[in-house]
Curated annotation (Swiss-Prot):
Pathway annotation from the record: Plant hormone biosynthesis; brassinosteroid biosynthesis
Family annotation (PANTHER family): BRASSINOSTEROID-RELATED ACYLTRANSFERASE 1 (PTHR31642:SF145), TRICHOTHECENE 3-O-ACETYLTRANSFERASE (PTHR31642)
Compartmental location: Endoplasmic reticulum; Nucleus
Gene it is expressed from: BAT1
Lineage: superkingdom: Eukaryota
The name this protein goes by in its record: Brassinosteroid-related acyltransferase 1
Top-level EC class as recorded in UniProt: transferase
Keywords: Acyltransferase, Brassinosteroid biosynthesis, Endoplasmic reticulum, Lipid biosynthesis, Lipid metabolism, Nucleus, Steroid biosynthesis, Transferase
EC number: 2.3.1.-
Record field: transmembrane: none
GO biological process: brassinosteroid biosynthetic process; phloem or xylem histogenesis; regulation of cell growth; response to abscisic acid; response to auxin; response to brassinosteroid
Family classification: Belongs to the plant acyltransferase family.
Active site: 164 (proton acceptor)
Length: 458
């Protein structure tokens, strides 16, 4: 949309936001786990809310500010900053009350209706979030930022960024729900945070000590699955270098596409493909997407291909993580085969069984080995790994229900922005259908038509 791309976003004000109350239980330093340290960048999402009055909009920003002040009083690491440990190589969170940043803005002359289908990624969305300049120094980066942008129609958007070192998807969801609730409820104790999802009081637990690597345990339990994972990645890197000896990377541009599947369509696809075999929507869609993407890529039949998907480990550690754990608590499970085996020999039922086996393998030994591997040296960014299909399941985190709207109304839509790894496939709740799923994936422009045809033809 050229008109929208050229539209100026006018910044009305930018201010720092600090915790409203002093938390006497606050730690000055939170030692991060290796899971937390993998991606300190801000992860952005934009929440869209339709028509409101000017007076209502004027109160939106102030209510959000008050709600954030109150929320950070309990979720106090959100007001901190990242910093290196004494050795100068590992990130931790300094709880120094450095504060979050909020911006009020106006999209001059733009109506929400002009954005078209909100489920489809639009480069204009990048203007609806505040992106602090870092110059490579993460110690000055706020861990939470927000931008409230008013549109000409009276609607508005709330663009939120949170550091992935601070939260994973589940804890980000809980934090944002608490923030939305605190923006509208004023007669509550300053030590309690309401989670709108279940209408219960939750207390976040920020201590990561249960996920710090126990090297003795790692030596005792050498997880073959995680070793296999890294062998696949290494093999893919070697193959790429052999084919591109000058290491000239191809165009890294991706097209972000969203495929909307309602519950009836998913059930119809399952019945047609599985012939009575019972499985979850995630299992079916993961297996089907892996085959569709691999087929669209046109890989050599002897090429090794790999499916990896995030698994929540909160209840999988020997001592389950406490309710309200606010850090990163996921590892990747892995399934591998050759392209020939995947496309010509394996049925969807057999792929689903492999997915189940991979998920079942996530125990304390796997977790220990995975985290130990993440703490190893990193010689640089990986080259493109076309053979690797990545999936993140957000269907248990209905972000569109976040009540930042008038009187706590849910969002009309929540759009995640382009992530650091754009080819990751996200499975998200379909706000129009409780059993539906939105599948969002980054694709090479040359593969869009092929993937679309294979994925939708089932």
């Amino acid at each position: 949309m050229p008109m929208l791309m050229a539209t100026r976003i006018d910044i009305i004000q930018k201010l720092n936001v600090y915790p409203r109350f002093q938390n006497h239980d606050k730690k000055k330093l939170i030692t991060l786990s290796n899971l937390d340290r993998q991606c300190p960048l801000l992860m952005y999402s934009v929440f869209f809310y339709k028509n409101t009055t000017t007076r209502d909009f004027d109160s939106v920003f102030s209510n959000l500010k008050l709600g954030l002040e109150e929320t950070m009083s309990v979720w106090y690491p959100a007001a901190g900053r990242l910093g290196l440990d004494g050795g100068g190589c590992k990130l931790n969170i300094r709880c120094n009350d450095g504060g979050a940043v909020m911006v009020e803005a106006v999209a001059t002359g733009v109506k929400l209706s002009e954005l078209g289908d909100l489920t489809q990624y639009n480069e204009f969305y990048e203007n609806l979030v505040y992106k602090p300049s870092l110059d490579g120094d993460f110690s000055v980066m706020p861990l939470v930022v927000a931008q409230v942008t008013r549109f000409a129609c009276g609607g508005y958007s709330i663009g939120i960024g949170t550091s992935h070192s601070l939260f994973d998807g589940i804890s980000a969801y809980e934090f944002i729900h608490a923030w939305a609730s605190n923006s509208h409820i004023h007669n509550k104790s300053n030590s309690k945070i309401t989670n709108k999802k279940e209408d219960v009081v939750i207390k976040p637990v920020h201590d990561r000590r249960n996920l710090l690597v126990n090297r003795d345990a790692v030596r005792e339990t050498n997880a073959a699955a995680i070793c296999h994972l890294y062998q696949l990645i290494k093999q893919a890197m070697m193959t790429y270098q052999e084919q591109n000896r000058n290491l000239e990377l191809p165009d890294s541009g991706f097209v972000i596409k969203t495929f909307e599947l309602n519950g009836d369509a998913i059930e119809s696809m399952k019945k047609k493909s599985l012939e009575g075999f019972m499985c979850s929507s995630f299992e079916f869609l993961a297996a089907h997407l892996w085959k569709a993407r691999t087929r669209a890529l046109g890989l050599r039949r002897d090429a090794m291909v790999c499916l990896q998907f995030a698994v929540d480990i909160r209840k999988r550690t020997e001592t389950p993580l406490p309710e309200g754990f606010s850090g990163n608590a996921y590892v990747l499970a892995s399934v591998a085969s050759t392209a020939r085996e995947l496309l010509e020999e394996l049925t969807l039922e057999s792929i689903v069984n492999k997915i189940r086996e991979a998920k079942k393998s996530i125990d304390q030994g796997y977790i220990n080995s995975y985290m130990e591997a993440l703490g190893g040296s990193n010689d640089g960014n990986l080259p493109p790994l076309k053979e690797l299909t990545l999936i993140s399941d957000w269907t248990k985190m209905p972000f569109h229900n976040v009540g930042f709207g008038n009187g706590g109304e849910p969002a009309d839509y929540m759009a995640p922005l382009c992530p650091p790894v754009p080819q990751v496939a996200y499975f998200m709740k379909n706000p129009k259908d409780a059993k539906g799923v939105l599948v969002r994936i980054g694709l090479d422009p040359r593969d869009v038509n092929g993937f679309s045809n294979h994925f939708l033809d089932c």
